[in-house]
Amino acid sequence: MNNVQALPGAFPLHADKDFNTESEWVILKLLCRPLMEIDTTDAEELSRASGGQIRIERADELIRIVRISKLPGLGTWIARLMGEAGFDEAQVRTVKAEKIMARINERMGYPLCNDATVRALADLQIKWKGQREGSGT
């Protein structure tokens, strides 16, 4: 869980909420695969291991959500929205915050993410860039 507070008026980027269905939870439990550790596998393998009960497309989405949620400052709630909007972890780091939030709003059908949310994500992107440059990666 992230221990970050949202900017006033911004969507709580740090918030965690369940993002998998109950049946997905049961399948992963039976496979002895903790949800937050599926980011080390690929979608085809996860789908195959589930006997096809988790479609490849959904497995890919779940993996993206987990990877995004591991970025500092982001929780599973916004990670789910980003993953369902088609973004992966690398894109969340590099695509302009305005474009990410616009796609989420478009997909939702209403303005969930406002200008304050865009600024909050842009600030996180600057921090991530600084962390990557500082680590030499």
Residue ranges and their predicted role:
Residues M1-T137:
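C-terminal extensions
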